Amino acid sequence: MTNMSRVERRKAQNLYEDQNAALADDYVDDGESLPTRQSVKNQREQKKKQGKTKTPLFTVLAVIFVFVPVIVLVTLFYLKSHPDNHDDYEDVFIDSSQSKYEVVPKSEDKNDTADTKETALQKESKKEPEDSKPKEQTAADKKQTAVAEKEDSPNKEEATAAAASSSQSTVQQQEQPAEPVQNVPNRVVKHTVQKKETLYRISMKYYKSRTGEEKIRAYNHLNGNDVYTGQVLDIPLMDE
């Protein structure tokens, strides 16, 4: 719809310009002639040409797409025609004894390389027996320690068993409670608990202190300090 409307407007504008050009040809204002129809058309065409902006991007892209394959082909052809010359390189050998890189020039004889290899092999052969000696010593030491451990294992087991038995006996002796030394009372008094009488009062009556509570409780096999009215208690007394 937008394209059709633009075309229609463009046609109406062209028609309007043509009409103005026709009127300009027929009328003369103040003795000066108006531009002709042909001149108006020429001006309009020039404006259209000037309105079209020339974008160089398309031309640049076209040139790039043309020249890139050409450059690639030229480089490939050059590389194929001029291969790398490997004769210019020199051989490099590594001496394991010094751990340094040595560059052997191409002009030297091959005998030097053979000599260096022989010296390296001799040094390695000397190092091998020296390295094997400590390994043999360590193996012999391990064997001796294993034999000694086997010989000592029965003695260790006997010692551990004796220590365990002694520790068990000591623990049992410690766990056994010491038998309390019971003092035999000189005489025992029968006491009948009266109303509102407590173990504390009975102790103060016979022993004049609270130490008698424990004695009365132990002698009568009481679990606590509670006594009831009418209960008969045995009061052990020690004559001083």
Swiss-Prot record:
Residues 26-52, 100-185 are annotated as: Disordered. Residues 189-235 form the LysM domain. The chain crosses the membrane at residues 57-77. This is Uncharacterized protein YpbE. One of its GO terms (molecular function) is lytic endotransglycosylase activity. Residues 160-185 have a biased composition (Low complexity). Residues 103-159 have a biased composition (Basic and acidic residues). It is found in: Membrane. CDD domains: LysM. The keyword Transmembrane applies. Its main location: membrane. The keyword Membrane applies. Pfam families: LysM. InterPro entries: LysM_dom, LysM_dom_sf. It is a single-pass membrane protein. Keywords: Membrane, Transmembrane, Transmembrane helix. SUPFAM superfamilies: LysM domain. GO terms for cellular component: membrane.
